């Protein structure tokens, strides 16, 4: 009996291993059919099997490449019908030998040799891999414990799939919470007028101000005149009945006017909404023209006209030189000369706007104007009664593709939905795997129209439409708020000369210049003109004198009256044609002292052989404004320059012919005060000052008569920087002139 514990203990170990291996197989994942471990056939005598000693019951499993024992991996379970087919229990596995009466040796028998423990043999080589067994039956294991969630995977990179078929309209959901008031939308186009609804119940009398006059309605059809009924007898006044609920009756026949009742109490001020803005009235007549504006400033002096040709020289004998008479009185104003050529256009006048004219009489009522612009959208009215369910809306824009959900249970086959509109062609996908050919399905019936879906989101803003027809001119709006200062623009081109500005305040006169050195004593001047004395007071009558001696012979008497005309003389001899003006001048006669000047100052030979004199005279204009201060002003545009005594490059006139000269200058003032001086040999002999007023173009002029000797210089100059507003332009000329009155 001492031998029994070994085989029984070995049997229990084998059963435990078999059951544990079955549990392990049901709990893992399935990776395919693995070969069973090689079974070591028991070495049995005729009846008693031979077992290995305790501690080496488990056969050796060869290791795979990954370090795990072959056949010991956890099989992976798949979904569906992919459970591993394990061999049916107690059929394919060789049953262990039963330990019963057969394992116990009978009396008289010999003890099995397996009970005698021998030496451990050498480790054998692994046997060849056996053929795969038949698939086992699906296991029914206990679900394992839920594993921990794995680490978050990398974000998938996929291409957008094809748009899915439009789903069936869902059932009407519960009404959502009231959303916030959205922004005020744009005024939509005027809808088609709906059918006239039934008349509503008679409302309470409103308290409001009368609105504006409405548009005249269309005249209704003229009704038939009914027969005039007879007045019935007046009945007794019955008790006051309950308030009825009836429709307002037709208006009754107008009764006779009643007696004028007492005035009622003044009612409370009405509270009502302002009426609709009326249409703009007809345009009134034009007002009377305003009073004429003030005359603009005087334009610049025009260009002097062209001097006419000289007259034909007279024919006469030179008379004797008479005694120079006393200077006569100034002559009267001569007759008006011929008008000169029209000057260039003056500067535009600056006139102030006239006073508004009196209000004109009210004009006749005009034709009703065109329909005015559409008014602003009124306040939001009370919500109306819910209308009937509308037609199903258009399918909404497909939303973004959501994350893949868990695989659900296969649902029943749905009905065929409404064929949606053809979607836009998607991007070309990658070629997929070859699928199995499917069975052709049956065409489903068209389902009933679904409930009205929820309003879709507001679509994107459409593209700008075509430019519409310009609308009617609207009512001028109110003055808007002051805009933000804009970005300074680029510097523009220089504009045309502006209108002369107004003169500013007069500036201080600069200090006088440093007195120059004392000049050399001049030549003695010419004798003065004979004086004109007034007769004195008559003296007392003296006593008669003694008769005087015989006086000298008296002066010849006055010439007698002209005698009778003499006989006709010989035919006249015409002198040759004189040269053009400016080439020479005739003999200038006596000088200031009554003596003829010598013909030594530039005498020229005329075309007819006689002496000719060119007058020293000039007129020059300034073309550029604001010349430099402290230097002669260069009047650089010449109109006339006799004998070339004026140099336009320096602005200086140099005397060549001694005599008495007359100089004049005319200057314009703009942008500042102007102070000019007429210089003779670097000494100012005359000053002219003009004050500038902003917005006005002012002018100043001066003239002087100077006695010049050969070599004397005359010019204009501005002595101070504080008054240097000497201006000139294309149509605004500043000029400098001078000419010889008579030589010395």
Curated annotation (Swiss-Prot):
Keywords, alphabetical: Angiogenesis, Basement membrane, Cell adhesion, Collagen, Extracellular matrix, Hydroxylation, Repeat, Secreted, Signal
UniProt entry tagged with the keyword Secreted: yes
Main location: secreted
Conditions for induction: Up-regulated during vascular injury, in atherosclerosis and in diabetes.
Biological-process GO terms, alphabetical: angiogenesis; camera-type eye morphogenesis; cell adhesion; endodermal cell differentiation; endothelial cell proliferation; positive regulation of cell-substrate adhesion
Note: Four consecutive Gly-Pro-Pro triplets are present at the C-terminus of the triple-helical region. These may provide the high thermal stability of this region.
Protein name: Collagen alpha-1(VIII) chain
Gene for this chain: COL8A1
């Amino acid at each position: 009996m001492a031998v029994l514990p070994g085989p029984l203990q070995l049997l229990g170990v084998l059963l435990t291993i078999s059951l544990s291996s079955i549990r392990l197989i049901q709990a893992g994942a399935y990776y395919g059919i693995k070969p069973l471990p090689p079974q070591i056939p028991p070495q049995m005598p005729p009846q008693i099997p031979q077992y290995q000693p305790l501690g080496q019951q488990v056969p050796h499993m060869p290791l795979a490449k990954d370090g795990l024992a072959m056949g010991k991996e956890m099989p992976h379970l798949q979904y569906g019908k992919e459970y591993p087919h394990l061999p049916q229990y107690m059929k394919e596995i060789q049953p262990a030998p039963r330990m019963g009466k057969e394992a116990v040796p009978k009396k008289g028998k010999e003890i099995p040799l397996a009970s005698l423990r021998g030496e451990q043999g050498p480790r054998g080589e692994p046997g060849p891999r056996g053929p795969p067994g038949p698939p086992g039956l699906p296991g029914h294991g206990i679900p394992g414990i839920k594993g921990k969630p794995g680490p978050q995977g990398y974000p998938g990179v996929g291409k957008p799939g094809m748009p899915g078929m439009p789903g069936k309209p869902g059932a009407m959901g519960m009404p959502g919470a009231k959303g916030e008031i959205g922004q005020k939308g744009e005024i939509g186009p005027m809808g088609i007028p709906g059918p006239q609804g039934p008349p509503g119940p008679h409302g309470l009398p409103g308290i409001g101000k009368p609105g504006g006059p409405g548009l005249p309605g269309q005249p209704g059809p003229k009704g038939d005149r009914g027969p005039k009924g007879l007045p019935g007898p007046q009945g007794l006044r019955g008790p006051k009945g309950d308030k009825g609920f009836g429709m307002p009756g037709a208006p009754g026949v107008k009764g006779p006017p009643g007696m004028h009742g007492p005035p009622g109490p003044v009612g409370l001020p009405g509270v009502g909404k302002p009426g609709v803005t009326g249409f703009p009235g007809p345009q009134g007549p034009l007002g009377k023209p305003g009073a004429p504006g003030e005359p603009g400033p005087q334009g610049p002096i025009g260009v002097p006209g062209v001097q006419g040709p000289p007259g034909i020289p007279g024919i006469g004998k030179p008379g004797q030189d008479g005694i120079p008479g006393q200077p006569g009185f100034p002559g009267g104003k001569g007759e008006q000369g011929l008008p000169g050529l029209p000057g260039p256009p003056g500067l535009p006048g600056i006139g102030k706007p006239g006073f508004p004219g009196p209000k004109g009489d009210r004009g006749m009522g005009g034709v009703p104007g065109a329909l005015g612009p559409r008014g602003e959208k009124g306040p939001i009215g009370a919500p109306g009664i819910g209308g009937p369910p509308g037609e199903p809306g258009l399918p909404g824009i497909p939303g973004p593709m959501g994350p893949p959900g868990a695989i659900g249970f296969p649902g029943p086959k749905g009905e065929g939905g409404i064929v949606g509109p053809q979607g836009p062609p998607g991007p070309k996908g990658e070629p997929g795997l070859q699928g199995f050919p499917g069975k052709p399905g049956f065409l489903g019936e068209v389902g009933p129209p679904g409930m009205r879906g929820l309003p879709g989101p507001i679509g994107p803003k459409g593209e700008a439409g075509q430019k519409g027809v310009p609308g009617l001119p609207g009512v001028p709006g109110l003055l808007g708020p002051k805009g933000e200062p804009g970005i300074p623009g680029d510097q523009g081109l220089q504009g045309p000369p502006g209108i002369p500005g107004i003169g500013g305040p007069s500036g201080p006169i600069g200090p006088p210049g440093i007195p120059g050195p004392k000049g050399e004593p001049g030549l003695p001047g010419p004798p003065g003109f004979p004086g004109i004395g007034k007769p004195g007071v008559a003296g007392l009558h003296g006593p008669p004198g003694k008769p005087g001696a015989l006086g000298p012979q008296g002066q010849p008497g006055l010439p007698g009256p002209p005698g009778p005309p003499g006989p006709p003389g010989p035919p006249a001899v015409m002198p040759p044609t004189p040269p053009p003006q400016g080439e020479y001048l005739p003999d200038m006669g006596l000088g200031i002292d009554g003596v003829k000047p010598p013909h030594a100052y530039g005498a020229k030979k005329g075309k007819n052989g006689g002496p000719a004199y060119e007058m020293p005279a000039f007129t020059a204009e300034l073309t550029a404004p604001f010349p430099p201060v402290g230097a002669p002003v260069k009047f650089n545009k010449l109109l006339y320059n006799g004998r070339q005594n004026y140099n336009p490059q320096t602005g200086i006139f140099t005397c060549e012919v001694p005599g008495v000269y007359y100089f004049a200058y005319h200057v314009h003032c703009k942008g500042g005060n102007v102070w000019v001086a007429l210089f003779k040999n670097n000494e100012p002999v005359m000053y002219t000052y003009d004050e500038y007023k902003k917005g006005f173009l002012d002018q100043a002029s001066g003239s002087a008569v100077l006695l010049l000797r050969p070599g004397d210089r005359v010019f204009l100059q501005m002595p101070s920087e504080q008054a240097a507003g000497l201006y000139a332009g294309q149509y605004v000329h500043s000029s400098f002139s001078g000419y010889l009155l008579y030589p010395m």
